[in-house]
Design a protein with these regions (language model features):
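Short helix-capping/hinge SLiMs at alpha-helix to coil transitions
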Residues: 17-21, 67-68
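Key DNA-contact positions within bacterial/archaeal DNA-binding proteins
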Residues: 38
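A short alpha-helical element within helix-turn-helix/winged-helix DNA-binding domains
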Residues: 27-34
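Conserved segment of winged-helix/HTH DNA-binding domains
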Residues: 69-93
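Beta-hairpin "wing" of winged helix-turn-helix
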Residues: 50-65
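Alpha-helical residues within the helix-turn-helix
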Residues: 31, 48-49
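C-terminal regulatory/oligomerization modules of transcriptional regulators
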Residues: 94-148
Length: 148
């Protein structure tokens, strides 16, 4: 399973802003995180609309987090940047076969598990993992649980 480029780039950008802790220009974020600048600007609009970042226009403008890194989850970023409609808004067949109902139930269960897991990981968790990476690698431990 892979994230869309928009989600991965958005996570890179928001994590960079969390690490810096100050206003960063779009050029700085794009260069440091290897994100095409025009694409970053589009993603930043979505992240701003979702209340994840502040965007200040102008010569001394740029981006910063709109709230503390411990209050922004991976799910928040994912939801801000994905284009899919939530499963609850998708058209379901009224007279669905048992097979279709089973498939829908399985997909819904996977989606719920993924959302629960992603909501448990905050930007602060990711920053701590980056800072602890060397000791984690040496000890063989991981900071994030692997879904069973």
């Amino acid at each position: 399973m892979h994230f869309k480029a928009s989600v991965e780039y958005g996570m890179r950008a928001v994590l960079y802003l969390a690490e810096k802790g100050s206003i960063c220009s779009s050029r700085e974020v794009a260069d440091e995180m290897s994100i095409p600048r025009d694409y970053l600007i589009q993603l930043a609009q979505l992240l701003r609309n979702a209340g994840i970042i502040h965007a200040r226009p102008g010569k001394n403008g740029g981006y910063s987090l709109a709230k503390d890194a411990s209050n922004i989850s991976m799910l928040d970023i994912f939801n801000a940047l994905q284009n899919d409609r939530p499963r609850s808004e998708r058209k379901e067949a009224e007279d669905a076969s048992d097979l279709l109902q089973d498939i829908t139930a399985a997909c819904s269960a996977v989606e719920r598990e993924m959302e629960e897991y992603m909501s448990s990981i905050t930007l602060q968790n990711m920053i701590e993992r980056i800072h602890d990476k060397e000791s984690d690698t040496a000890s063989g431990s991981t900071r994030f649980r692997t879904p069973a």
